[in-house]
């Protein structure tokens, strides 16, 4: 069974080279085991470095542009079996998948699985500078297998668990590590991620 072809979306204030380094132990093991191969998409929205939930998708126009850019890239370079997003890359991924399903009812989703690392569901910033989850949009999340890797000390931990619960119409697994808003390369966590990818690959092959 061929490995999954995965497209990776980096987070706020980051880039593809940083994300490659952050995911290095994970992608190395998955490649060695023939489970998945990875490609990287550079973001087009300038942002400040560091964690945070403001400053990226502050208006409807920037959200639409980011989703359109991702859809265009997939049409030109796909198909991909799955898409992986870290931090704001996860938010874009969730936004894109829900919006695509809402605009194209009955169509196949643009990928067959999704991986969210330290993710936040689609949201808009409230007047108090706190994210307001767009539950109406989340209702359109496609029925595809998802993997959620979250940090128990992450400032978005609560939002990450909301995202996982909102995608549970299909197979959705949660892997929690003891760190914060970062990609954990703890050997035990890396092995768990490898196992989850293997399970997703089997489910995709079986069409469930």
Curated annotation (Swiss-Prot):
Coiled coil: none annotated. Pathway: Secondary metabolite biosynthesis. The active site is at 87 (charge relay system). Phomoidrides A and B (also known as CP-225,917 and CP-263,114) are potent inhibitors of Ras farnesyltransferase and squalene synthase. CP-225,917 and CP-263,114 inhibit Ras farnesyl transferase from rat brain with IC(50) values of 6 uM and 20 uoM, respectively. CP-225,917 inhibits squalene synthase with an IC(50) value of 43 uM and CP-263,114 with an IC(50) of 160 uM. It comes from the Eukaryota. The keyword Hydrolase applies. One of its GO terms (cellular component) is cytoplasm. Keywords: Hydrolase. InterPro entries: AB_hydrolase_fold, FSH-like_dom, LovG. Pfam families: FSH1. Its EC number is 3.1.2.-. One of its GO terms (molecular function) is hydrolase activity. GO terms for biological process: secondary metabolic process. The keyword Hydrolase applies. Disulfide bonds: none annotated. Belongs to the LovG family. Hydrolase; part of the gene cluster that mediates the biosynthesis of the antihypercholesterolemic agents phomoidrides which are dimeric anhydrides. Within the pathway, phiM releases the C12-fatty acyl chain from phiA. The pathway begins with the highly reducing polyketide synthase phiA that catalyzes the formation of a C12-fatty acyl-ACP, starting from one acetate and 5 malonate units. The hydrolase phiM is involved in the release of the C12-fatty acyl chain from phiA. This is Hydrolase phiM.
């Amino acid at each position: 069974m061929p490995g999954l072809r995965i497209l990776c979306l980096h987070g706020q204030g980051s880039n593809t080279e940083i994300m490659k380094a952050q995911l290095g132990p994970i992608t190395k093991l998955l490649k060695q085991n023939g489970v998945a191969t990875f490609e990287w998409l550079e973001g087009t929205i300038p942002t400040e470095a560091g964690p945070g939930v403001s400053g990226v998708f502050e208006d409807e126009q920037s959200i639409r542009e980011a989703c359109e850019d991702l859809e265009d890239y997939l049409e030109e370079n796909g198909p991909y079996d799955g898409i992986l997003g870290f931090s704001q890359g996860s938010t874009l991924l969730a936004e894109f998948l829900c919006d695509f399903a809402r605009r194209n009812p009955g169509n196949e989703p643009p990928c067959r699985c999704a991986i969210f690392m330290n993710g936040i569901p689609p949201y808009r910033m409230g007047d108090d500078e706190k994210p307001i989850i767009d539950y109406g949009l989340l209702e359109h999340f496609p029925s595809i297998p998802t993997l959620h890797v979250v940090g128990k000390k992450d400032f978005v931990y609560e939002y990450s668990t909301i995202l996982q619960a909102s995608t549970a119409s299909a197979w959705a697994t949660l892997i929690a590590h003891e760190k914060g808003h970062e990609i954990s390369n703890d050997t035990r966590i890396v092995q768990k991620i490898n196992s989850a990818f293997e399970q997703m690959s089997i489910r995709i092959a079986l069409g469930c």
